[in-house]
């Protein structure tokens, strides 16, 4: 625990960075002597040890973080827990931790049902003449036992089909055991049951047999080809009895299979190849290294060694089967004495090796995975059990942090290697393929994709990388439902429908705490996640309560992720709003009633809930609380009724109807049974946008006022303006309707409905979330279509004598939306006849619904959450700062000061090309686009340019010259440049040249031409030209 780096005095709450091991031991002795310390005593000890002078507010915040028991003393366990959490927060892997499962996307089908089952899948990169390898360009190859080889493009479109039949067998069909691609030589190798190797030329569209290596002692079962521009290409061979051999191809002679004009197929015996009679290649026989069929071979270039594995010999006598046999060998290619042997019970069927970390993983027929240190072969470091059948394929990912293994039943398991735990079990392959057909697999490191073939070829993405040119990533795995800001700890807490609770350090884009599966329930014996729908902090901002869709409430210490208490408002009653007051917790939802859980004697224990008077006739959808005196609570139901409650007594004193806001509705204080109306239609989630809204461009449609009043209106959000006085002339309560309008009420007993304004500019859009600053100067609204709008509220529904003056010039400098435009956008046109409240900004922040908004007054930052699973940070003017959880980093933000104007702002990649002009202007900070010509002016310019080029309105037609005036011969046609085919090793140039036929030349009498030239007289040409100009001048005179 020694301090590695110097203490940063700008963050005095990070004690783990200041205290050394000696300091912690000194504190332990003090706590061991005194048992507990008072705040002042702890402050004195920390000041003496660290030398940091704590301010009163800073130390009070620090003590509240340490004091988990919420008493007046600090215990040793509390201090150690706080230091441990600090070290966990500094873990660099906390940012890289993914919330998604390794295989979270849908499975894709590359090829449908095949005639012959696929036994091997390979990918060949493009190798240029200079030896450079381009993995982004290449082709796929699928092999079958029936010797049918199919070649596919990179997008799995068919290229060609080759048949690797034997030229010697007439009636008996061949059986292919293994195949290998030689991409640097454009050859394809086939190992068959006839104990021979066949090499096919696969240049262009051909599949021609060129060379056969026959008379191999045993059939080859495993092939592996390795090529490099700097070293010799190598092919590792493993046969049926455990022999391993290596064939080397010389780099100075890239034609090991030279064309022989005498024979179409070159044949060579394997004994001649081993004896060195073939000058193009050499073969090294390492003998019988394994006891049985070689299952897999692989070459390790960094160690100049190869790895081979096999199962145990099944023909061993019964009394010797318990004896361990050599199942895996690491053999140096040059130094034969450098050989490492691994003995595994029942043998090894497949392996994965990381040469950088010397890390080896083996899988056997017993279904167990064994982790080895390749330098120690006596005992595995760990054994992972989980497969019920033999493991047939595996690979490592992300620097050996994840291990993927597949068994014979086509079940894929993903393991966390450092923690030795199982992350995920993926069984979709087993249900999509025939169970009796064995499967093969290939992992593409370029696309991070696992391709599995049997009777079909299917693929899944394994931890795919984020395309940063398209998106900044995601913050949650499912839509985000709640977003909270804790000013005490200066963090942001987000809750999602994926049942995740994440604590974010928004200043540095880091995940501090992740609570997975926060709410769960058992359905039909399976543990299922429950969506989180509501959350809030306690008055001291140290604890958090969350509400779920099944009616459950949980109390959390969100810093440590520990659960403290559980409650419920009713079975299968979704919690839509929850508030934590000093007297208790208020929760409401689909139970039609407000439930209060009084605070127990310890301040943490909560007895059973007490229901308030039931006045709502339908499910409660939203609520808002006013914590200024007198405290009040507003709740709204699905039918549009708003009820105002006195928070101290729990009595209702006001009631409104959204469809008829001016009508005075008496509050029913009599306890009577209110029948629940039957729903005529299924409710739609705000997190799932309807498809027909995406398929067409929406326009503003104004419905008649009478038609709007006749229908029941749903209220999506309520908001109290707590900074305004409690007076009937002040608008203190806002309610957003389903029509896109916001109603304004006064929650004073003598007040009521005051007015409304339209807050959207797109048909079908509506305000889902509202928030405001601490002074109620601005109103921030988030809409269903992803727009964020900022309104000036300081002079809206305020008495005329109390309205402050509006400095429009200062607002214009702060909000780029207010700049004058040549053609006003739709957002400005929608409020042209609506002078108040003043629209300060409007821009599209998300592609889908905005589910929550948080405004931080000190830093002037606006944080938005959306159903597109992202949390984005904006400035108050609309500039994009970043996305929480994105791999894109940004400079550390100051939580107490606004962002400087010279900050490197960006535009979200998903909004870069598909937003309106108004949104683009706001995201660019007022910078103008290049003014393009309109379509009419552009077409007129093209028309004038066309007229200048063409003649008489159409292009010239041949012949371009008058043959009577210019009696030339026939004009030869245009010959394009030849296109050479460089896919061959030798380019036949003369076959591509277009040579015209030779014509007979007419003989010319050269002597006659010379005589005529001598008779020409040019002496009087100068006088003739002068006389011509004199006549011309006389004419003009």
UniProtKB/Swiss-Prot annotation:
Domain of life: Eukaryota
Keywords for this protein: Repeat, WD repeat
Gene3D superfamilies found in the cross-reference section: YVTN repeat-like/Quinoprotein amine dehydrogenase
WD repeat ranges, renumbered to this chain: 122-162, 171-210, 343-382, 386-425, 475-514, 527-568, 615-657, 716-755, 762-801, 845-884
Gene that this polypeptide is encoded by: WDY
PROSITE patterns: WD_REPEATS_1, WD_REPEATS_2, WD_REPEATS_REGION
Name the record gives this protein: WD repeat-containing protein on Y chromosome
Keyword Oxidoreductase applies: no
Residues forming coiled coils: none
């Amino acid at each position: 625990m020694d301090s590695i780096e110097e203490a940063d005095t700008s963050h005095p709450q990070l004690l783990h960075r200041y205290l050394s091991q000696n300091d912690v031991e000194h504190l332990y002795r003090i706590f061991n002597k005194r048992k507990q310390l008072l705040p002042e005593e702890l402050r004195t000890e920390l000041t003496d040890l660290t030398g940091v002078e704590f301010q009163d507010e800073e130390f009070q915040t620090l003590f509240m973080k340490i004091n988990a028991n919420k008493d007046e003393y600090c215990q040793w366990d509390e201090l150690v827990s706080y230091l441990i959490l600090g070290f966990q927060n500094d873990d660099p892997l906390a940012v890289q931790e993914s919330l998604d499962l390794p295989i979270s996307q849908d499975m894709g089908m590359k090829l449908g049902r095949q005639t012959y089952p696929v036994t091997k899948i390979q990918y060949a990169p493009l190798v240029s003449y200079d030896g450079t390898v381009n993995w982004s360009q290449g082709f796929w190859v699928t092999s079958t036992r029936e010797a049918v080889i199919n070649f596919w493009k990179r997008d799995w479109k068919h290229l060609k089909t080759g048949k690797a039949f034997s030229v010697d067998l007439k009636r008996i069909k061949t059986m292919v055991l293994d195949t290998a691609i030689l991409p640097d030589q454009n050859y394809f190798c086939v190992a068959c049951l006839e104990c021979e190797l066949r090499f096919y030329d696969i240049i262009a569209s051909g599949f021609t047999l060129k060379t056969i290596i026959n008379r191999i002692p045993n059939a080859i079962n495993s092939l592996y080809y390795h090529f490099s521009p700097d070293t010799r290409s190598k092919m590792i061979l493993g046969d049926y009895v455990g022999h391993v051999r290596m064939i080397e191809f010389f780099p100075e002679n890239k034609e090991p299979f030279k064309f022989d004009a005498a024979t179409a197929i070159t044949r060579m015996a394997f004994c001649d190849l081993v004896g060195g009679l073939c000058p193009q290649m050499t073969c090294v026989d390492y003998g019988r290294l394994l006891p049985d069929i070689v299952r897999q071979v692989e070459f390790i270039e960094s160690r100049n060694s190869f790895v081979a594995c096999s199962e145990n010999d099944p023909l061993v006598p019964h009394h010797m089967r318990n004896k361990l046999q050599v199942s895996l060998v690491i053999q140096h290619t040059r130094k034969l004495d450098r050989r490492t042997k691994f003995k595994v019970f029942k043998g090894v069927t497949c392996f994965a090796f990381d040469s950088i970390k010397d890390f080896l993983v083996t899988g056997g027929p017993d279904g167990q995975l064994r982790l080895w240190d390749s330098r120690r072969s006596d005992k595995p470091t760990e054994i992972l059990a989980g497969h019920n059948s033999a493991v047939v394929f595996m690979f490592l990912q992300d620097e050996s942090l994840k291990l993927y293994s597949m068994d014979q039943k086509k079940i894929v398991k993903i393991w966390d290697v450092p923690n030795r735990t199982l992350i995920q079990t993926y069984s979709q392959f087993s249900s999509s393929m025939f169970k009796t057909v064995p499967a093969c697999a290939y992992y593409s490191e370029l696309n991070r994709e696992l391709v599995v073939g049997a009777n079909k070829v299917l693929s899944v993405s394994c931890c795919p990388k984020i395309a940063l040119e398209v998106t900044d990533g995601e913050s949650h795995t499912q839509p985000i439902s709640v977003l909270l800001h804790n000013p005490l700890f200066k963090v942001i807490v987000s809750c999602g429908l994926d049942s995740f609770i994440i604590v974010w350090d928004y200043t540095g884009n880091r995940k501090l705490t992740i609570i997975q599966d926060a709410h769960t329930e058992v359905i039909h014996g399976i543990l299922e996640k429950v969506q989180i729908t509501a959350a809030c902090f306690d008055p001291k901002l140290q604890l958090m309560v969350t509400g779920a869709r099944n009616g459950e409430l949980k109390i959390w210490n969100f810093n440590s992720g520990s659960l403290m208490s559980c409650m419920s408002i009713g079975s299968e009653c979704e919690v839509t709003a929850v508030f934590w007051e000093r007297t208790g917790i208020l929760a409401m939802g689909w139970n039609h009633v407000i439930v209060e859980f009084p605070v127990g004697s310890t301040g943490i224990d909560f007895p059973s809930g007490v229901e308030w008077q039931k006045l709502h006739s339908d499910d409660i959808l939203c609520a808002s609380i006013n914590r200024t005196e007198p405290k009040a609570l507003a709740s709204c139901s699905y039918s549009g009724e708003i009820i105002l409650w006195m928070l101290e007594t729990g009595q209702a004193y006001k009631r409104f109807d959204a469809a008829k806001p001016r009508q005075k509705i008496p509050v029913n204080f009599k306890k009577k049974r209110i029948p629940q109306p039957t729903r005529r239609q299924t409710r739609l989630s705000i997190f799932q946008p309807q498809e027909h809204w995406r398929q067409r461009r929406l326009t503003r449609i104004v419905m008649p006022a009478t038609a709007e009043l006749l229908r029941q209106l749903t209220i999506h959000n309520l908001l109290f303006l707590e900074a305004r006085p409690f007076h009937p002339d002040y608008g203190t309560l806002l309610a957003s309707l389903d029509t896109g309008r916001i109603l304004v009420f006064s929650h004073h007993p003598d007040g009521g409905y005051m007015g409304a304004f339209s807050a959207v500019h797109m048909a079908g859009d509506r305000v889902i979330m509202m928030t405001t600053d601490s002074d109620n100067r601005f109103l921030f609204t988030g809409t269903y279509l992803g727009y964020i709008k900022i309104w000036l509220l300081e002079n809206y529904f305020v008495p005329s004598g109390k309205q402050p003056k509006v400095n429009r010039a200062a607002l214009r400098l702060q909000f780029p939306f207010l700049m004058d435009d040549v053609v006003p956008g739709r957002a400005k046109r929608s409020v042209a006849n609506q002078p108040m409240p003043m629209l300060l900004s409007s821009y599209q922040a998300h592609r889908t619904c905005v589910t929550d908004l948080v405004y931080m007054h000190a830093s002037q930052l606006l944080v938005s959450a959306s159903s597109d699973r992202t949390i984005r940070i904006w400035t108050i003017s609309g500039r994009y700062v970043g996305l929480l959880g994105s791999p894109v980093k940004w400079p550390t933000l100051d939580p107490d000061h606004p962002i400087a104007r010279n900050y490197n702002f960006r535009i979200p990649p998903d909004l870069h090309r598909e937003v309106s002009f108004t949104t683009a202007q706001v995201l660019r900070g007022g910078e103008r686009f290049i003014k393009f010509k309109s379509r009419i002016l552009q077409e007129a310019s093209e028309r004038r340019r066309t007229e200048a080029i063409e003649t008489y309105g159409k292009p010239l037609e041949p012949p371009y010259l008058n043959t009577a005036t210019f009696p030339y011969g026939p004009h030869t046609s245009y010959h394009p440049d030849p296109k050479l085919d460089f896919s061959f090793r030798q380019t036949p140039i003369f076959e591509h040249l277009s040579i015209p036929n030779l014509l007979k030349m007419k003989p010319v009498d050269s002597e006659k031409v010379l005589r005529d030239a001598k008779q020409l007289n040019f002496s009087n040409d100068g006088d003739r030209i002068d006389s011509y100009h004199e006549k011309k001048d006389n004419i003009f005179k």
